[in-house]
Amino acid sequence: LGVFATSSVLGPIIGGLFAGASQILWINGWRWVFLINLPIGIVALFMVVSFLHVPHTPKQHRIDWLGAVTIVIAVVPLLLVAENGRDWGWDSTESIAMYVTGGVGIILFILAERAAKHEALLPLSLFKSKTFSMATILGVIVGVGMFGGMMTLPLLLQIVMGATPTEAGFMMLPMVAGMMTATIVSGQITSRTGKYKMFMVIGPSLLALGYLYLTSFSADTQYWQASIGMILIGLGLGQLMQTLTLAAQNSVPASEVGVATASATFFRQMGGTLGVAVFISILFNNLADTIPAAFKRADVQAGLKAALKDPKVLSDPNNAEFLKGLQSGNMGALAGKLNTDSSFLNHLDPRLARPFLVGFADAGVTVFAIAGAVVAVAIVIAIFTKAPALRTKSAVQEAAAANAH
């Protein structure tokens, strides 16, 4: 799980490298965001086949085809609305149709899993364990707060601090360092003491503290100041990710460890998808308020007045669209470009670009505040979640012992 958590943060770094490259092996750089999974997947499959040798007793099983179909009906519409809701409108006909279809799919999936019983894709008996249920809820909440808030950071680094995608990726390294450190330390303590409940509470507490710290982010924030918040977030995630899965794994019978692990990961990823969709929507929708408010700030107005008296600024064609919008009193079109392409800010006179930077930073602060509040809920739930004792035997060993009797 520490590997997964670290990979979640390394992803934007590597993705930034690909996005910033014009071509790699004669293929557009951004396409490697998808293509990189092919060689990695092939290596992973080779290692599994070569090194993972688990004793297997053939048994007759029935594949839960109905569960597989209904979970697709449930999940795909929700993913579509999460991806397109900001463009469609969250209350549009298309979005409502996706909500309804997804809701019907969830009901059908539950009915299918009840009928499949122990052969179910997701055995509902797992939720009889209060710990598993609480760990699942925690996973969803943490996924929302983790991915939703974390995906905002690279945008702020690029738009407000002027970093390229590649630079923004490397600027996330403090979070990676915090995560790896916390993962190693908490993992060692857990393996030596068998106790991990404290990390279920400390983890989200540090995560919330990191978001709380980042609510002080502004257009004047220095990178070293932002990196403190990243380290706190990394320290929180490094402790939390693996312990949530440990709680889920140790709350179910040994024979169900695999499906419990997969389920915990699935629900966390769904929470992350929801978090990214909602928080990015909040970020860009907030710009309609924060950018006009930034134009009214005294320091911004002073800079604008000085720039408008500068002949070089007035004659620069890069400033023409801004000046036209300012003259008409409608900056909406230019502000709207931040949704798709913020590169125009790099060519504007810094005094003209400042209200956009201030407004974007203020919108990001709103996201961090909401993400922190979401994670605070996780802290409360974690306090009341029971942490089962760690197993002393693997599932294979337990099965062998049961067969011996």
Q: In which residue ranges do the predicted regions lie?
A:
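Transmembrane-helix exit segments and adjacent C-terminal regions of multi-pass membrane proteins
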Residues: 43, 47, 53, 111, ...
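Extracellular/lumenal inter-transmembrane loop segments of multi-pass membrane transporters
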Residues: 16-29, 85-89, 159, 191-192, ...
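Hydrophobic/small/kink-forming positions within alpha-helical transmembrane segments
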Residues: 9, 13, 72, 180-181, ...
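Small-residue-rich alpha-helical segments with characteristic i,i+4
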Residues: 1-14, 20, 149, 155, ...
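Helix-loop-helix hairpins in multi-pass membrane proteins, especially solute transporters
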Residues: 1-67, 93, 177
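Symmetry-related core transmembrane helices of the 12-TM Major Facilitator Superfamily/SLC fold
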Residues: 32-48, 70-74, 97-105, 366-383
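Transmembrane core module of solute transporters
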Residues: 38-39, 66, 80, 88-259, ...
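Membrane-embedded alpha-helical segments of multi-pass transporters/permeases
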Residues: 42-50, 107-111, 212-215, 281, ...
